[in-house]
Amino acid sequence: MKRLQAFKFQLRPGGQQECEMRRFAGACRFVFNRALARQNENHEAGNKYIPYGKMASWLVEWKNATETQWLKDSPSQPLQQSLKDLERAYKNFFRKRAAFPRFKKRGQNDAFRYPQGVKLDQENSRIFLPKLGWMRYRNSRQVTGVVKNVTVSQSCGKWYISIQTESEVSTPVHPSASMVGLDAGVAKLATLSDGTVFEPVNSFQKNQKKLARLQRQLSRKVKFSNNWQKQKRKIQRLHSCIANIRRDYLHKVTTAVSKNHAMIVIEDLKVSNMSKSAAGTVSQPGRNVRAKSGLNRSILDQGWYEMRRQLAYKQLWRGGQVLAVPPAYTSQRCAYCGHTAKENRLSQSKFRCQVCGYTANADVNGARNILAAGHAVLACGEMVQSGRPLKQEPTEMIQATA
């Protein structure tokens, strides 16, 4: 089987190279935005979507135009890749996978991609990029496989390179034969049906006061001044640090779970729906807005979607599988007798069945219900719906996160 893998390193460009990279990223952003604007005009005129083949001719037209001849100074392939990114964004929108494409803003996700023409010298920790030349990078691990494309990106004032490779590997067979249910939560990041518990790292919560202080300082500075730019970079670095802490911890958790279990059953949680604002409208204001806002922050701080993504590809690489089941009533159902009632969940950590008297940790009970749902799905050979797809947190948890 063929495996696609990405290796990300920090670049060490020279002063002139850094200026060129900023210019290339700006050119790619310009091409993307201008093509999107033309697509919008075409749509308003009542015409159909214009595919990539036609958009590529626009690029030739813009390069020959007097006011945009500066596009010739940028490599052609990254500009073409920007148009392909726009085409992919439209396809995702048509398939209802993403929202309608939006214009790119300067300083946010500045990047450009080379599909070919790249040379990698791992022994000397350097890479050759068209129109940029040889550039050093922080070589932290060996790149394996055939290089398919290279993406250069900027984050918090630093430049990074992502090298995507393709390699041929034998079909993996997972060393374990066990199956486990995983219950994701706020008080506990993940609880397994065998009783294993992974505590949350809460990287945002731990840095929330520092972030608020930096944002207050930013509000007192003149917008777009040098001091304002410096303060904004401090906030960006803190956000990056928070995300890195969360991602690193999730990698450790998902690796530990993936190594020990061939089949992992999780809840099919809709995080975007669960973390929607409760503010409501002027005519119909929401209730418990502050408490819901605190719960939303706690949910997003855990990184449930990222944990699911990591589990999926790690299981694929190890020969295992991830199975998503409907999350309805897993926190209210007794894992022993199957009785489902809201009163069974006494608190965040306590579960006691009102019928059979079964007592257990609430998260462990939920994980066992998830495992049982996974067994039912495998037995039936199809997804089993068991009510509305909603995972409820107890009232005391909502209050505690406010």
Curated annotation (Swiss-Prot):
Zn(2+) binds at C334, C337, C353, C356. The active site is at D183, E267, D363. GO terms for biological process: DNA recombination; transposition. The keyword Hydrolase applies. Its EC number is 3.1.21.-. The keyword Disulfide bond does not apply. Keywords: DNA recombination, DNA-binding, Endonuclease, Hydrolase, Metal-binding, Nuclease, Transposable element, Transposition, Zinc. One of its GO terms (molecular function) is endonuclease activity. InterPro entries: Cas12f1-like_TNB, RNA-guided_DNA_endo/Transpos, Transposase, Transposase_put_HTH. In the N-terminal section; belongs to the transposase 2 family. PANTHER family: RNA-GUIDED DNA ENDONUCLEASE INSQ-RELATED, TRANSPOSASE. An RNA-guided dsDNA endonuclease. When guided by an RNA derived from the right-end element of its insertion sequence element (IS), cleaves DNA downstream of the transposon-associated motif (TAM). Cleaves supercoiled and linear DNA in a staggered manner 15-21 bases from the TAM yielding 5'-overhangs. Binds reRNA, an approximately 150 nucleotide base sRNA derived from the 3' end of its own gene, the right end (RE) of the insertion sequence (IS) plus sequence downstream of the IS. This is Putative RNA-guided DNA endonuclease InsQ.
